[in-house]
Regions:
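Phox homology (PX) phosphoinositide-binding domain
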Residues: 2-163, 167-176, 450-452, 457-467, ...
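Conserved beta-strand elements of beta-rich interaction domains across eukaryotes
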Residues: 6, 28, 42-44, 53-54, ...
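Beta-strand cores of modular interaction/reader domains in eukaryotic scaffold and signaling proteins
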Residues: 22, 36-38, 46-49, 56-57, ...
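Short amphipathic alpha-helical molecular recognition features
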Residues: 29, 40-50, 54, 75-93, ...
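Amphipathic alpha-helical interaction motifs in eukaryotic regulatory proteins
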Residues: 38, 53-63, 95-103, 113-117, ...
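Short amphipathic alpha-helical segments embedded in low-complexity Lys/Glu-rich regions
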Residues: 53-54, 71-83, 108-120, 239-240, ...
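LRR N-terminal entry segment and analogous cap-like coil->beta motifs
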Residues: 135-314
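Leucine-rich repeat domain C-terminal region
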Residues: 207-218, 230-284, 288, 344, ...
């Protein structure tokens, strides 16, 4: 994969930075003594614990490599080896032993590297360990469809290692050649950066405060960034040429931070561009079709979103968004997830979501569906876990021609008697194939709704034919039924009567719906649609 440049042995630590090792304490652990070792390289410090037997194993490996004299390690002691004076003397001798190993060469051989955990905390140790791993696995990782996970420490080590004019590997060991890393990152297509708000192990480094550069990842198509500080990430703009999927979690407070690293110039650049599209002087992320900005601290959908003109799917769930803005620029978007935000109104949303087919607004603060009535491409709508109370709110979406799935779970509306039947009755022919709250419409529900629609159709036809006088008995009974429906539903929509209102017009005709056990009537006498329509006609 790479040729090893001329080099000395081992791995050099942090360039010319001072390296110091101290055995700061000795602790009795069960039947042995553990020595606490503190290592400092530049401004990074970490601690480890080792027992004497581990020192002995290290020494044997170094002797085999002819790196130390056999007598250099303090000898074993079989009697009184737990005595305080002896432990203190050995602590000092082990400290001298380790410091001598560090001082003898700028480079650390692999056994010493692992013993002191330079492969976890030191940029040279980390880059060497990564190079060795990639020597064996790089081709398989690049060829697979699995996302390669990397840490900020690994990326920081690569970034810093590239800045130094040093040999590419140690002791002509082709396995640890840094060239393997360079070859790998230029071929990698799928990557997830897994950060943290915590310290890196026992060290003084904070994981999300490590800067790194992504500009060399020039073939990357999928990038997920979790728990990082985006202002410390260099080279993001270089990914515009290849990136197709972008996910950022627990990282930003605004979309602009990740989409427009040159954010300070945004206002002027926007003014220079067309009002209905991305600014002319700002290169767009033209290949990104999917963006996932879940679990951040976003308060708004800012205008930098227009720099993602090819988006088809956008996930903004689990944020603090209160309004749906600036999405009119995403003319290709079909799937939008705004669940678990703070949205309370949908006024005018159709003007911003013209081609949407799937919309999730679950877990917001909605009390009405007003504003969704012109989303003519909408197929799936999830408004579960909101504050929708009245059945007639569904009227706002009942004429959408493509609607197939509606989720109203965990809304007050679901506690209304015959809730499913009343909701399905508001739709036209779509109710037959409708999925409501994740449940497909049953044949029993289809029959119920068909009867309700037939009754309503017959009533509407007779009312039109008779042209009822204001003072006629029929008009009075009709008005009474409408008033009862208004009381049952505070929205006071008088365009249609519920089953309950129609049936209460005259109790002697008992216009019950088959399968409605709440009527208390003998269903065997009410199963025929013809009889029910005849009863309605007799009333007229």
């Amino acid at each position: 994969m790479a040729q090893c440049a001329n080099s000395s042995e081992g791995t050099m630590s942090e360039g010319s930075l001072k390296r110091e090792v101290r055995v700061v304490a000795a602790r009795a652990v069960e039947n042995h003594t553990a020595y606490v070792i503190e290592i400092t390289v530049g401004d990074c410090k970490w601690t480890i614990q080792r027992r004497y037997s581990e020192f002995h194993d290290l020494h044997e490996k170094l002797v085999a490599l002819k790196k130390v004299e056999k007598a250099q390690l303090p000898p074993k002691k079989y009697l009184r080896n737990q005595a305080k004076s002896f432990v203190e003397k050995r602590r000092h001798e082990l400290e001298v032993y380790l410091q001598t190993l560090l001082d003898e060469s700028n480079y650390l051989v692999t056994p010493l590297l692992h013993f002191l955990e330079f492969d976890i905390y030191d940029i040279y140790g980390v880059s060497q360990a990564l190079a060795t791993e990639l020597f064996e696995k790089a081709d398989a990782i690049v060829a697979s469809d699995d996302v390669c996970e990397m840490t900020p420490m690994q990326l920081y080590a690569i970034t810093e290692r590239m800045k130094l004019a040093l040999p590419t590997c140690a002791a002509n060991d082709v396995r640890s050649d840094i060239g393997h890393i360079m070859d790998f990152i230029t071929r990698l297509k799928l990557m997830r950066i897994v950060g943290s708000r915590n310290k890196l192990g026992s060290s003084s480094r904070t994981v999300d405060q490590l800067p790194f550069d992504l500009s060399r990842f020039n073939n990357l198509e999928y990038l997920q960034v979790d728990v990082c500080t985006v202002s410390l990430i260099e080279g993001l703009s270089e990914l515009k040429k290849t990136l197709r999927y972008l996910a950022v979690h627990h990282t930003v407070k605004s979309i602009k931070e990740i989409i427009l690293p040159e954010g300070d110039h945004w206002t002027n650049l926007e003014a220079a561009g067309p009002s209905n599209g991305p600014p002319s002087h700002v290169p767009t992320w033209k290949f990104i079709s999917r963006a996932d900005f879940r679990y951040n601290n976003l308060n708004e959908i800012d205008d930098s979103i227009k720099l993602l003109p090819s988006l088809t799917r956008l996930d903004l769930s689990h944020n603090n968004i209160t309004e749906i803005n600036n999405l009119q620029y995403l003319s290709y978007m079909t799937h939008l997830d705004l669940s678990h935000n703070n949205i309370s109104s949908l006024e005018g949303v159709h003007a911003r979501l013209g081609n949407i087919t799937s919309l999730s607004l679950a877990g917001n603060e909605l009390t009405s569906l007003k504003g969704l009535g012109k989303l003519y491409s909408l197929v799936q709508l999830d408004v579960s876990k909101n504050c929708i109370e009245h059945v007639l709110e569904v009227n706002y979406i009942s004429n959408l021609p493509c609607i197939e799935s509606l989720n109203l779970k965990d809304n007050p509306i679901t506690s209304i008697m015959d809730y499913r039947t009343k909701v399905l009755d508001l739709f036209q022919d779509q109710y037959v194939e409708m999925t409501l709250d994740g449940i497909k419409t049953s044949q029993k529900e289809i029959d119920k709704v068909a009867i309700l629609k037939a009754i309503q159709k017959a009533k509407d036809g007779k009312t039109k034919k008779l042209g009822m006088r204001k003072d006629s008995p029929m008009r009075k009974r009709h008005n009474l039924a409408v008033n009862q429906a208004d009381i049952a539903d505070p929205t006071q929509r008088k365009s249609s009567l519920s089953t309950k209102s129609v049936c209460s017009m005259n109790s002697q005709y008992s216009l019950t719906v088959p399968g409605d056990e709440a009527s208390g009537m003998d269903n065997n006498n009410n199963n025929c649609l013809t009889h029910q329509i005849q009863a309605f006609r007799l009333e007229i």
